[in-house]
Amino acid sequence: MYKIEKLTVKNRCEIPVGSVVEIEVSEEVHIHSDLGKQCYGQFYLRKCLAKKGLLQCVHSPFPANWKGKPLIVVKNDDVAPIELRADDEIGCLWIFTHKY
């Protein structure tokens, strides 16, 4: 079973060519862990941003009972700067739940 949380960019930013940056998101996420269930979260960058040359640098899953605002680390691997406006959707956090 899974649940999808859409994440949006908090502040406008321009990512220069070759730069690695941390992008702050607006939403706070809580990955609940119920008794008898194992939960974790995984962030996926929007495909349209990946096609522009934005690469997701960190793929570590978010552990159970994690609460906070995710910090997304990306690299601009394109030949031109990439602009992200405030409230643009950056990607989705998928929260997976498995029974023991």
What are the roles of these predicted feature ranges?
Residues 1-100:
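DUTPase catalytic domain/fold
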